[in-house]
Amino acid sequence: MSWRKRRKLPTTIQVHMLDDDRVEVFGRRMNMAQKILLQNTLQQTKRKQKYKIPNALALPLQKLAMDNKWEYEGIPVLLLQLKDQLRTRKLDPFHTDDKPHFTKLWKELHTHQQDGVAQIIQYYKGKALLADDMGLGKTHQGVAIALYYMMEGRVLVVCPSYLRFHWENALTEIGGIPPKDVLVIKKTEEKPICRFNIISYDMLPRDKCEVNKTKFSMLICDESHYVKNRKAKRTKAMMHIAKQCKRILFMTGTPALNRPIELFSQMHMIRPVFAKYSTHFAKRYCDGKMTDYGYDDRGHSCDEELNWLLKKVYMVRR
């Protein structure tokens, strides 16, 4: 049974122009977010008529984004309206009386680091890709964000094996966390029983790894370009953990090494609404096409659109 048969969606949406030039939308089976976005879209068109809109316009945003229906009878698609919804409010001051570790570290951060931490906490709600250049202090920002959310539950830090003890020192020395609350996992059978648990990428996909059986509140991935291959075992293991986490922070100085498809797995784990299916993502942003040797997703297309989407929805980069 097809998706459209399972969910009956309206083919006609009535649009009324009010006296004060406001737009009111009437459509069955539309949630409030879709109505608000559609009203904002039509507000700019100022067309006083009844629109015949395809079913795709009432579907979830990921369906919209991947159907290549970016305009219909002069109406911009809902995805493009996100730029009017995002980054419009000023960041509020922090209320961190109950977070002494975070408050202490916050005062020691540089201005650009404070700005990055504030964006990820207040704007991205703890789910973002921190892609600052090398030397700008991504580790300090990552520790600060981990301290802010530490009371929500266990935190898992995944990094290359040579950075495990670097993260241990960062949490204890920079973050002021007691050493008994930080665990560097050296064996697959070792259970992540501490508040902060650190494991390497190589150990994560092993069958007997206890980390895969544990639920975490926050996931931090340092050098996240290690999960660029969506078919690799480490990436699949990471996706399994990310589904259960409320906060996800990816950190890398090179978010995409060569091709846009290498961004898919990170975008899918952080916020899958715009990167739910790899084939749709490849068709839109990687010039995906079928060849004699199979499906080719090594190209690139709609570069400006992808760059805008990353800056507005996923990434902090200075």
Question: What residue spans do the PLM features occupy?
Answer:
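Walker B catalytic acidic pair
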Residues: 222-223
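Walker A/P-loop
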Residues: 125-145
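Conserved pre-motif I regulatory segment
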Residues: 90-131
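Accessory DNA-engaging acidic/polar modules
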Residues: 1-104
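Conserved Walker A/P-loop ATP-binding site and its immediately adjacent core
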Residues: 139-141, 152-173, 257-262
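Conserved helix/coil segment N-terminal to the catalytic DExD/H
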Residues: 188-218, 229
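Conserved helix-turn-beta segment of the N-terminal RecA-like "Helicase ATP-binding" lobe
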Residues: 163-186, 270-274
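Conserved P-loop NTPase motor "coupling/switch" region that bridges the ATPase
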Residues: 151-154, 218, 235-318
